[in-house]
């Protein structure tokens, strides 16, 4: 005792405990560390060796723990101040102070304190995380910490001290990595300590007379046996894979789930109300035994008399369903599908690789039961519990995969120095000034478009005019401006630029109107935007020739002036051919005869034919057709009629020549078929022009109008043609004018 007192006195003389407690408010702070470094030489001089110093520390800790006159908080402060001295002393001089001494002293103190006091002592590890750095489970402070923690877990009750158990597990998870062998359970062993024995049903205490009550009690007894048999089988899951146990488990689980569903639908108790318990009953436990945390599952008593009340408890049914879902997932790990998946994942831990393989029938039954259990959860708790359980099962699948791969380290290895150097070089290249590109936006077109955009932003792309089809009227101002610039242009390149711009705007205007105003295209002349806009607005339009545009712009709706002149000439030739094709009355010698009514109606019909002429759409000239035909070509027709009498024989060979002979004409006059002959001759002319474009137009007219007996008549017609040609030379031809019919006298001769 004197040695003990001497050591304790020597320690307190060199180490002022009160001042140490004041400085140690923040555990292992820098001020406290400086204070210990100043005192350490005097502490070392007070003791002969490290053993004497360690013995003095133990005596001081035991004496402080025995002092009952001071409170627990004050005793803990003194103990923590002494233990902190050991930690700092080990950093100063490892040979004089062992690094295991604080842990060993705490292990000894845990054995002489109660559970509540141990919970306070365990705070020393939680408030000093620096002690957990570099700790391993197989040497140094690691095994001591594991012994302290495991011993406390064995002493603690999971129901009454659940929070303290959680603190221990959290500290161990922070101190040791997940792949630590001591906590990984590599073999997948199950805790079979709380196993059930064989379930025996005791007979009811009171006899049952009513048949309804008899069937109800029989059903209740069957469910009681099935439920507690499930508890016996679930206490050791590997035994469920036996051939004689698995069918019993499937039947018992199915009956339990069906009973829980019938209770949920109020059909299990045969119309009776759910059993209730009198809250004032003296048989109930006191409040301190039943006020437990709602997050901790209750532990139910095995009793037939209480089973009816347990079934009415929703938490009881929920706990049973969750237990079944976990067991179903364990059994389905032995199905063929999951085993094949694990083969592909290349599991290396053979201890957890399933050996027994379920049959397809058992797999389908377990899948159906699992679906029924999840459906019950969805109905009972509106799907919230169901989603939580599915997420937990999914996370557990990841832990199974990790354990099957041999619990590899979850920490990523350090990056190789070569990879770091490569990354640094890449960053330097990114920070260097890039080479200036020829085109900032990738090509010339995009760069020019970007420069023209100016201060336009992405909001401008949302404007309506960016995606709305423009109206033809929107191009009219631009077309007028381009026409003005073309007229005022001095340089050829400026004129060329505005001609291209005019062609583009014209094409876009007609393209925008093609779906809505196609009917107005006939009033636009040869592609005039102004005429198109006037036609759309309902204004009267007049024929207007659009300036010629070079064909290099590929604008097909606008033609040049030369093509326009050729179209006019072709229309004049066609009108003249229709004039010669009109039927006339002839006498026996072939002379033209005209009665008085026809004389009077000649002038009237002249005005009609001006409006009756069909509109001919302009067509581009084709090869083989003479485009120089004009009003003077009719004079050349008379010369051809005089000089080429041999062609009349070829005309008589024409299948349609019998229609044009004088005899047939006389017959047609008798049958009053004057207009039919006219239509047939006109159609013949049109067909000849389209089929024989390589021949001269005058030859086609000669072929239709000539006959063997009309040589004298053709001579008279040539004189008329000469006179008509001279008149047409004096007067310019009009695109919409019609040729006049020749006037004849009473004897049928033509009056010039």
Swiss-Prot record:
InterPro entries: THO_THOC1
Lineage: Eukaryota, Fungi, Dikarya, Ascomycota, Taphrinomycotina
Keywords: Phosphoprotein
Extent of Polar residues compositional bias: 695-718
GO biological process per UniProt: mRNA export from nucleus; poly(A)+ mRNA export from nucleus
Residues recorded with modification Phosphoserine: 202, 582, 707, 738
Top-level taxonomic group: Eukaryota
Region: Disordered, residue numbers: 596-752
A cellular component annotation (GO) from this entry: nucleus
Transmembrane segments: none
Name this protein carries in UniProt: Uncharacterized protein P25A2.03
